[in-house]
Swiss-Prot record:
Protein name, entry field: Transposon Tf2-11 polyprotein
UniProt entry tagged with the keyword Nucleotidyltransferase: yes
Chain positions recorded as Mg(2+) 2 binding sites: 990, 1050
Post-translational modification: Processing of the polyproteins proceeds by an ordered pathway, called maturation. It involves the initial cleavage of a 27 kDa capsid protein (CA) from the N-terminus of the polyprotein, followed by the cleavage of a 56 kDa integrase (IN) from the C-terminus. This leaves a 72 kDa protease-reverse transcriptase fusion protein (PR-RT), which does not seem to be processed further.
Disulfide bonds: none
Active site: 271 (for protease activity)
Domain Integrase catalytic: 979-1138
Domain Peptidase A2: 266-342
InterPro entries in the record: Aspartic_peptidase_AS, DNA/RNA_pol_sf, Integrase_cat-core, Integrase_H2C2, Peptidase_aspartic_dom_sf, Retrovirus_Pol_polyprotein, Rev_trsase/Diguanyl_cyclase, RNaseH-like_sf
Boundaries of every Reverse transcriptase domain copy: 436-615
GO CC, alphabetical: nucleus
GO biological process: DNA integration; DNA recombination; proteolysis
Gene name per UniProt: Tf2-11
Species this chain originates from: Schizosaccharomyces pombe (strain 972 / ATCC 24843)
Length: 1333
């Protein structure tokens, strides 16, 4: 039968229309009355009856009535050629064949066996079909179909309806169960039908009518449970009469579906003919929608045949403002990005408006669904169910009352209510009224009370809770422990049947100790109330409730019950003992007057959900809702949201391989010194985590009767282990995984000690499993030497090993060796860091806590073995076992390993250079220094001359040279400037800028006499010109003290301008400039500036914009203070007298103010001696802090220090510490050098530098090949040399950097890279040097 024929027949079968069902009630009583009315209409001879009183006799009448029509079902039938004129007769024959193909089943016999599965005759199958139909639909759908079918005219269809009515009456009498959950939708070609169904439909042609498909036999899977018979049908979707029938067209439209959780929208086909919700793989990838495997794995037919093996999680979708939540099957190809099926629309009461091309949502008809009933065998305990008990004040149980002890009695809580909107006010009043009615709260006169707030419940209503956070600060903690989840799950091993109990309003089952009620007072707009039962929100409530329930359950808790708070799980190994176990627990609860929430209880199940896990006899997996919570998580916007996400992941970490590795990029964002910046790395990390949760592994229950295997391993930074047990199929299945960081001290352990540490930590982690084993369990390690250390009875090497050996005596185990290649799980775990486990403190060492590592791959091993053939000594060890034994060297996987677990390598080879480069430049430690790099490499490798080779490599590293500061003393001794012979011959000048504006000025011009130290202070502006400065200097200095012989100043543009040069020529003085970025050459002015600024702060710190008004006072104060260098005041040296500084003091005049007088000459001579002595003293102290000058020769490469305000300074803190390298042109003084700066910066900076600002650039051509990033080469200036290395031509080029155009650099690069940068220069060099390329 073709798919097209099937679709046609499907439409023809829907030839009936529904009646208007508005206002129809759907209780069982109304449904029975509805049946009675239909029967009265079609079988009037039965008469009316009261179905509430006489249902059984009514059904008997129906049975008797149908026995009067035996002729309808003859034992034989005649085959006829059918035409359109004989269609009804053909349909009747079809109905007859379905009942009596074997000729052994009468209508009455069929009625007496409703729903029972016996044999394989067609009647039984038809019965199963009706049972499936009955359980497939909810009540509303069922009524719609009954009312529609009861009004059709053709006889045989009416007969089918009449048959189904008494059958349905029986089902309503037997049970109250409706199945509203829609089964998975299958393609027609995959749907399994009976042979009769296929044979019959092959005879139909497209023009013919056929029977409604809901009355055709289908294959069913029937399972029996304790109370109900449930039938699940694998079927094609049931099309609704609202949308699709033979008189209506197939509706199709395309709407934009909004996915708010993923901030995207997709075009979605709305098609009443589509059999399932589908979405294309391309759409899933584009919007990163989470998916999971689909075990059904069917073929989806049609125009685009697809094999489906994945589906999305339930997604929140908005269509025309209507919100729904549904899943999609993922297909490779479809006509639209996504499609919504008819079933999804119907389930969400959504109608299609074909005229408006829109969707609308109808009001849902509520179904009356009763809570699950308590099984009959436990009816004696029905008085402890929530159905029979309303919430009331419980009786106090002595010794188990809730006690609230405070750290202090005299405390006050803040008095403030949270504002409540009208909706919450109503909820609050309802809660208060209910609490007062039941007696669990009462009005209070307490002086301290906490505010109330509201939290949403799962069903959408609000729960009033008290915010006890202010009170919790004063409550003494309860140290009663909550159980560990892992230990609870361990008790379940071996159990096959489970019952889960949930206590109703669990906290409210415990009375508050008399006298403590006022401590739990709360306030709201209605007043102040206090709890008489234990409330939610108090910090000590969980611990007290755990103590309470443990005490109530007593001894049963230890054998067959586990409980976590109000969740109680009863587990047993057989059905018979389980009944006894459940009754024991229910009796305990009854004795304590506790109430169970029947709606949340599950009895006699093979698998249950408990405290977030799906538990069965095989093991446990996380509940799907916890997985969906992570899968639906949006991108975190801040640290708080990221911590919440990682908290959800951490709950599931035991099911996620390599959790720490996956979350590493996310944890980096939580560090205090890391700025929040979301990158694709974090996005990918979240996607990787979600993919791991699509199908999490099953962890088995630990069973003490099974063999135990512990596999351990240690990496450089962590330890790992996997605990497994051997099952009946002789395979080991995991019980748990473990990994943990090492502490700083542990990082320095030897390899053997690290491997031993992995065993110790694993045994401590699973001590509750492994400490009491009768038979020895097996430990596998990939470190052969460890076996001897554990089994050796000689004295331990150190105290640590002695402690470990003492600890191992508590365990019954045997240890075996297995190569690391076979121990891949534990090996991988040891390279994962469990970031939730605290790192143990250890005072033995404080060295670095992270070590790089090189992967020992097969290629690496082959390379080492190849290098061994070139080293005579190592080759001898490789081939001579006796020699290896003599030198305590092992041969492992082709590698020579010494007693320190170091791999022996030939000295100074390409391999050793590669190792150094990987650890220095490509590892997780960023360019470690010589000592650190040496220590790291020595942990895994050793060769002759290793320290020297590492030192040479690090010293020649370009990145280290330009970015790392130097720790040596500065170069160059101090060269003091000789003092002048008299005042105002030699001056120094500078500007103090960045002053607040005062009277129009914002800078200060400072002139200092180098002999007397006298200062002249002149207010000015920062925008002062050279001409204005010259005029000011003429009026304030030359006019009073005459022409100077020399002036020392910095390289300010004013003093280097042509205007100032003309001014100096006019007054015949020489300009001398201090070295750039060398304040010591003009230290006098710098020191004077500091003193002036200090004096200004003293006089105008409160009113800084008045500093101009105080300049004369500051100048007078400075010039009349005794200077440490001259031992006299500047004013006295210049003017030869001391002025009066207060009204109580008279000025002192000298009799000889003539500068040529003997006294004046003597004073000047004394000042000069003091200045010389001061210079010698300064030089002595300065030179103690410097080291010998490093002599540079012309042509040497040097780097220039980037000072805070100097050469090529960048405000960016991450800018390199040095610029360059530059070539030395010549030496221009005792301590100064002239450098070859690029033309682009020559006009900006002086090319002369003091030696203290220079560092030699080290460059070993044998070590540094292709050190330049090709994107950094701008313009090649010239090529210095070339080398052939491993059949590759390298060029040493001098170039202008692309990244920093102001810098000329040099380095090695490949020929190809150089040609891309400047083809002409490279070709000229090749031609001039006769290179064969």
């Amino acid at each position: 039968m073709s798919y097209a024929n099937y679709r046609y027949m499907k439409a023809r079968a829907k030839r009936w229309r529904p009646e208007n069902l508005d206002g129809i009630q759907t209780s069982d009583e109304h449904l029975i009355n509805l049946f009675a009315k239909i029967l009265s209409k079609h079988v009037p001879e039965i008469g009316k009856f009261d179905p509430n009183k006489d249902v059984e006799s009514y059904i008997s009448k129906l049975d008797q009535h149908f026995t009067e029509y035996p002729s309808l079902f003859p034992n034989e039938h005649t085959k006829r050629q059918y035409t359109l004129n004989h269609l009804e007769e053909l349909e009747q024959q079809f109905a007859e064949r379905m009942f009596s193909e074997n000729g052994s089943l009468t209508w009455q016999e069929l009625l007496r066996q409703p729903g029972k599965v016996q044999g394989s005759n067609k009647g039984d199958r038809l019965t199963k079909t009706f049972e499936g139909f009955r359980n497939q639909l909810d009540k509303v759908q069922f009524i719609r179909k009954l009312m529609s079918k009861a009004n059709v005219d053709d006889f045989h269809t009416r007969l089918f309806i009449l048959w189904m009515l008494p059958y349905s009456l029986r089902k309503l009498k037997e049970r109250n169960y409706w199945k509203s959950e829609i089964s998975e939708i299958y393609d027609f070609l995959e749907d399994k039908r009976t042979a009769s169904y296929g044979k019959t439909h092959k005879r139909f042609q497209p023009q013919n009518k056929n029977l409604g498909k809901e009355f055709l036999p289908k294959k069913n899977n029937t399972t029996n449970s304790r109370n109900l018979r449930k039938t699940n049908i694998s079927r094609i979707e049931y099309s609704s009469n609202k949308f699709l029938n033979h008189t209506r067209k197939r509706y199709e439209m395309v709407l934009q579906a909004e996915l708010p959780d993923f901030k995207c929208s997709i075009p979605c086909l709305i098609d009443t003919g589509t059999q399932a919700n589908i979405i294309t793989e391309e759409t899933v990838r584009a919007h990163k929608l989470p998916t999971r495997p689909w075990s059904k794995s069917v073929i989806y037919g049609g125009v685009y045949p697809n094999k489906i093996n994945r589906k999305t999680i339930k997604l929140n979708i908005s269509l025309n403002g209507i919100s729904i939540k549904t899943e999609f099957l993922v297909v490779k190809k479809f006509s639209h990005p996504a499609a919504i099926s008819f079933t999804t629309l119907y389930d969400n009461n959504i109608e299609i408006s074909s005229s408006k091309h829109t969707l609308s949502q109808m009001n849902k008809v509520s179904n009356i669904v009763k809570e699950p009933e308590l099984p009959d065998i436990y009816k004696e305990f029905k008085d402890i169910t929530a159905e029979t008990n309303t919430e009331k004040l419980p009786k106090p149980i002595k010794g188990l009352e809730f006690e609230v002890e405070l750290t202090q009695e005299n405390y006050r809580l803040p008095i403030r209510n949270y504002p409540l909107p009208p909706g919450k006010m109503q909820a609050m009043n309802d809660e208060i009224n209910q609490g007062l009615k039941s007696g669990i709260i009462r009005e209070s006169k307490a002086i301290n009370a906490c505010p109330v707030m509201f939290v949403p419940k799962k069903e959408g209503t609000l729960r009033m809770v008290v915010d006890y956070k202010p009170l919790n600060k004063y409550v003494k903690p309860n140290i009663y422990p909550l159980p560990l989840i892992e230990q609870l799950l361990a008790k379940i091993q071996g159990s096959t049947i489970f019952t889960k109990l949930d206590l109703k309003s669990a906290y409210h089952l415990i009375r508050v100790r008399k006298g403590d009620e006022h401590k739990l007072a709360f306030r709201c707009p209605r007043g102040v109330f206090e709890y008489l039962v234990m409330p939610y929100g108090i910090s000590i409530a969980p611990a007290h409730f755990q103590y309470f329930i443990n005490t109530i359950l007593g001894e049963v808790k230890e054998s067959h019950v586990v409980c976590y708070m109000d969740n109680i799980l009863i587990h047993s190994k057989s059905e018979s003992e389980h009944v006894k176990h459940v009754k024991d627990v229910l009796q305990k609860l009854k004795n304590a007057n506790l109430i169970i929430n029947q709606a949340k209880c599950e009895f006699h199940q093979s698998q249950v959900k408990f405290i977030g896990y799906h538990i069965s006899e095989k093991g446990f997996t996380p509940c799907q809702e916890n997985i969906d919570k992570v899968l639906q998580w949006k991108q975190p916007k801040n640290r708080k949201e990221l911590r919440q996400f990682l908290g959800s992941v951490n709950y599931l970490r035991k099911f996620i391989p390599k959790t720490s590795q996956l979350t590493h990029p996310l944890n980096n964002l939580l560090k205090k010194d890391v700025r929040w910046k979301w990158t694709p790395t974090q996005t990918q990390a979240i996607e990787n985590i979600k993919q791991c949760l699509v199908s999490p592994p099953v962890l088995r229950h630990f069973d003490f009767s099974k063999k135990i295997l512990l596999e351990t391993d240690a990496s450089d930074v962590a330890v790992g282990a996997v605990l497994s047990q051997k099952h009946d199929d002789d395979k080991y299945y995991p019980v748990g995984y473990y990994s943990a960081k090492m502490s700083k001290a542990q990082l320095n352990y030897s390899v053997s000690d690290k491997e031993m540490l992995a065993i110790i930590k694993s045994l401590k982690h699973w001590r509750h499993y492994l400490e009491s084993t009768i038979e020895p369990f097996k430990i596998l390690t990939d470190h052969r030497n460890l076996i001897g250390r554990i089994t050796n009875e000689s004295e331990p090497e150190n105290k640590r090993l002695a402690r470990w050996q003492l600890f191992l005596q508590d365990f019954n185990f045997e240890i075996n060796y297995r190569p690391g290649s076979a121990n891949h799980i534990a090996d991988a775990l040891s390279r994962i860091v469990d970031e939730t486990e605290p790192i143990p403190k250890d005072s033995e060492d404080n060295s670095i806590n992270f070590v790089n590592q090189i992967s020992i791959t097969d290629d690496f091993k082959n390379q080492v073995v190849t290098e061994y053939t070139n080293d005579t000594k190592l080759l001898n060890l490789l081939n001579n076992e006796d020699k290896r034994v003599e030198e305590n060297i092992q041969l492992k996987d082709g590698l020579l390993i010494n007693s320190k677990d170091q791999i022996l390598l030939p000295n100074d080879t390409q391999l050793t250079r590669t190792i150094i480069k990987k650890y220095h430049e490509e590892g997780k430690l960023i360019h470690p220094g010589i000592e650190l790099l040496t220590n790291i490499i020595l942990r895994r490798f050793t060769w002759k001359g290793i320290r020297k080779q590492i030192q040479e490599y690090v010293q020649n590293c370009h990145t280290c040279q330009i970015n790392k500061s130097r720790n040596h003393k500065p170069y160059g001794p101090l060269q003091p400037i000789p003092p002048s012979e008299r005042p105002w011959e030699s001056l120094s000048m500078d500007f103090i800028t960045a002053l607040p504006e005062s009277s129009g000025y914002n800078a200060l011009f400072v002139v200092v006499d180098r002999f007397s130290k006298m200062a002249i202070l002149v207010p000015c502006t920062k925008s002062i010109t050279a001409e204005q400065t010259a005029r000011m200097f003429d009026q304030r200095v030359i006019a009073y003290f005459g022409n100077p012989k020399e002036i020392i100043a910095d390289n300010d543009h004013i003093f280097t301008s042509q205007t100032w040069k003309d001014f100096a020529h006019k007054y015949n003085f020489v300009m001398k400039f201090s070295l750039p970025y060398r304040p010591q050459t003009d230290g006098q002015t710098e020191r004077t500036n500091q003193t002036v600024e200090k004096l200004l702060r003293c006089v105008c710190s409160t009113h800084p914009n008045t500093w101009v008004d105080h300049i004369s006072l500051v100048q007078q104060s400075y010039n009349n203070a005794i200077h440490s260098a001259t031992q006299m005041t500047p004013f006295e040296i210049v003017h030869r007298y001391s002025p009066a500084l207060s009204p109580l003091e008279l000025p002192s005049f000298s009799d000889k103010t003539d500068e040529n007088s003997q006294e004046t000459i003597q004073v000047f001579q004394t000042v000069k001696e003091h200045l010389n002595t001061n210079n010698i003293k300064m030089k002595k102290y300065f030179d103690m802090k410097i080291q010998e000058i490093e002599e540079f020769q012309p042509g040497d490469l040097v780097m220039v220090k980037r000072t805070k305000t100097g050469f090529l300074h960048k405000s960016n803190k991450l800018a390199p510490s040095f610029a360059g390298p530059f070539y030395v042109l010549q030496k221009s003084g005792p301590n100064n050098y002239e450098l070859d700066l690029p033309d682009s910066i020559k006009h900006m900076f002086s090319s002369t530098f003091h030696v203290s600002h220079l560092e030699k650039y080290r460059h070993n051509s044998e070590l540094n090949y292709a050190t330049i990033d090709e994107s950094d080469i701008g313009t090649i200036l010239h090529i210095l040399e070339h080398k052939n290395r491993e059949q590759v031509l390298y060029l040493n080029v001098k170039y202008i950097s692309n990244l920093n155009p102001s810098t000329i650099m040099s380095g090695w690069t490949t020929l190809a890279t150089a040609l891309q940068a400047d083809k002409a220069i490279v070709n000229d060099y090749i031609k001039n040097n006769n290179l064969n390329i």
